Protein backbone atom coordinates (compact mmCIF):
# COMPACT_ATOMS: atom_id res chain seq x y z
CA UNK A 1 0.00 0.00 0.00
CA UNK A 2 1.06 3.58 -0.66
CA UNK A 3 2.59 5.24 2.40
CA UNK A 4 4.07 8.45 0.98
CA UNK A 5 2.21 11.59 2.04
CA UNK A 6 1.62 13.40 -1.26
CA UNK A 7 0.27 10.42 -3.25
CA UNK A 8 -1.77 9.31 -0.23
CA UNK A 9 -3.28 12.79 0.10
CA UNK A 10 -4.09 12.92 -3.62
CA UNK A 11 -5.68 9.47 -3.53
CA UNK A 12 -7.82 10.60 -0.57
CA UNK A 13 -8.88 13.75 -2.46
CA UNK A 14 -9.86 11.64 -5.47
CA UNK A 15 -11.83 9.18 -3.31
CA UNK A 16 -9.46 6.36 -4.21
CA UNK A 17 -8.47 5.83 -0.57
CA UNK A 18 -9.93 6.31 2.86
CA UNK A 19 -9.28 9.43 4.86
CA UNK A 20 -5.62 10.17 5.31
CA UNK A 21 -4.30 9.59 8.83
CA UNK A 22 -2.04 12.32 10.21
CA UNK A 23 0.13 10.69 12.84
CA UNK A 24 0.89 13.09 15.68
CA UNK A 25 -0.12 16.67 16.31
CA UNK A 26 2.01 17.32 19.37
CA UNK A 27 5.54 17.39 17.93
CA UNK A 28 7.78 20.35 18.81
CA UNK A 29 7.13 21.95 15.40
CA UNK A 30 5.15 25.10 14.53
CA UNK A 31 1.89 23.24 13.79
CA UNK A 32 2.62 20.09 15.82
CA UNK A 33 3.02 17.76 12.82
CA UNK A 34 6.18 16.16 11.49
CA UNK A 35 8.42 18.10 9.14
CA UNK A 36 9.97 16.38 6.14
CA UNK A 37 11.97 17.29 3.04
CA UNK A 38 9.93 16.63 -0.12
CA UNK A 39 11.74 16.26 -3.45
CA UNK A 40 10.47 15.90 -7.02
CA UNK A 41 11.24 12.66 -8.85
CA UNK A 42 12.66 14.70 -11.76
CA UNK A 43 15.15 16.32 -9.38
CA UNK A 44 16.14 12.85 -8.14
CA UNK A 45 16.61 11.68 -11.72
CA UNK A 46 18.79 14.71 -12.54
CA UNK A 47 20.92 14.07 -9.45
CA UNK A 48 21.36 10.40 -10.33
CA UNK A 49 22.41 11.38 -13.85
CA UNK A 50 24.94 13.84 -12.44
CA UNK A 51 26.23 11.12 -10.11
CA UNK A 52 26.68 8.71 -13.03
CA UNK A 53 28.75 11.33 -14.87
CA UNK A 54 30.81 11.92 -11.73
CA UNK A 55 31.43 8.19 -11.28
CA UNK A 56 32.52 7.85 -14.89
CA UNK A 57 35.18 10.53 -14.39
CA UNK A 58 36.40 9.67 -10.86
CA UNK A 59 37.74 6.69 -8.96
CA UNK A 60 35.90 5.55 -5.86
CA UNK A 61 32.51 6.65 -4.70
CA UNK A 62 30.81 9.20 -2.45
CA UNK A 63 27.74 9.00 -0.23
CA UNK A 64 25.65 12.05 -1.07
CA UNK A 65 22.32 13.14 0.40
CA UNK A 66 19.67 14.56 -1.89
CA UNK A 67 17.00 16.97 -0.76
CA UNK A 68 15.67 20.49 -1.02
CA UNK A 69 16.92 21.53 2.42
CA UNK A 70 13.41 22.89 3.03
CA UNK A 71 11.27 21.34 5.71
CA UNK A 72 7.51 21.22 5.23
CA UNK A 73 5.05 19.99 7.83
CA UNK A 74 2.36 17.42 7.15
CA UNK A 75 -0.35 20.06 7.60
CA UNK A 76 1.44 22.44 5.19
CA UNK A 77 1.54 19.67 2.58
CA UNK A 78 -2.17 18.94 3.05
CA UNK A 79 -2.96 22.65 2.62
CA UNK A 80 -0.91 22.79 -0.58
CA UNK A 81 -2.60 19.65 -1.94
CA UNK A 82 -6.01 21.16 -1.11
CA UNK A 83 -5.12 24.42 -2.90
CA UNK A 84 -3.95 22.64 -6.06
CA UNK A 85 -6.72 20.02 -6.12
CA UNK A 86 -9.41 22.54 -5.24
CA UNK A 87 -10.72 20.19 -2.56
CA UNK A 88 -9.97 19.64 1.10
CA UNK A 89 -7.91 16.53 1.81
CA UNK A 90 -10.09 14.28 3.99
CA UNK A 91 -8.00 13.40 7.00
CA UNK A 92 -8.11 12.38 10.64
CA UNK A 93 -5.66 13.19 13.39
CA UNK A 94 -4.16 10.28 15.27
CA UNK A 95 -1.51 9.54 17.86
CA UNK A 96 2.18 9.67 16.99
CA UNK A 97 3.76 6.63 15.43
CA UNK A 98 6.51 5.22 17.61
CA UNK A 99 9.92 6.26 16.33
CA UNK A 100 8.83 9.10 14.03
CA UNK A 101 11.29 11.97 14.49
CA UNK A 102 9.81 15.48 14.56
CA UNK A 103 11.99 16.76 11.73
CA UNK A 104 13.97 15.18 8.88
CA UNK A 105 15.52 17.57 6.36
CA UNK A 106 18.43 16.61 4.11
CA UNK A 107 21.49 18.73 3.46
CA UNK A 108 22.26 18.87 -0.26
CA UNK A 109 25.53 20.77 0.26
CA UNK A 110 27.67 17.84 -0.88
CA UNK A 111 25.49 17.31 -3.97
CA UNK A 112 25.94 21.00 -4.88
CA UNK A 113 29.67 20.86 -4.25
CA UNK A 114 30.50 17.56 -5.96
CA UNK A 115 27.78 17.17 -8.59
CA UNK A 116 26.83 20.79 -9.20
CA UNK A 117 23.26 19.68 -8.53
CA UNK A 118 20.51 21.95 -7.25
CA UNK A 119 16.85 20.86 -7.07
CA UNK A 120 14.63 22.77 -9.50
CA UNK A 121 11.16 21.99 -8.11
CA UNK A 122 9.42 23.51 -5.10
CA UNK A 123 6.56 21.93 -3.17
CA UNK A 124 3.93 23.52 -5.42
CA UNK A 125 5.57 22.04 -8.51
CA UNK A 126 5.86 18.64 -6.83
CA UNK A 127 2.18 18.58 -5.88
CA UNK A 128 1.06 19.99 -9.25
CA UNK A 129 2.83 17.31 -11.28
CA UNK A 130 1.67 14.56 -8.89
CA UNK A 131 -1.90 15.89 -9.19
CA UNK A 132 -1.72 15.74 -13.00
CA UNK A 133 -0.34 12.19 -12.84
CA UNK A 134 -3.02 10.98 -10.42
CA UNK A 135 -5.79 12.42 -12.62
CA UNK A 136 -4.45 10.87 -15.84
CA UNK A 137 -6.33 7.91 -17.29
CA UNK A 138 -4.82 4.51 -16.53
CA UNK A 139 -4.74 1.77 -19.12
Please place each PLM-identified region on the residue numbering.
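Catalytic helix-loop patch of NAD(P)-dependent Rossmann-fold dehydrogenases
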Residues: 1-4
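C-terminal substrate-binding subdomain of Rossmann-fold SDR/epimerase-dehydratase oxidoreductases
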Residues: 6-139
Amino acid sequence: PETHLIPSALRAVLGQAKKLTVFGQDYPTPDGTCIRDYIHVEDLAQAHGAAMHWLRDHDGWQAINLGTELGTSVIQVLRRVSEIAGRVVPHVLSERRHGDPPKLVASAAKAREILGWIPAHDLGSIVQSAWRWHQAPRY
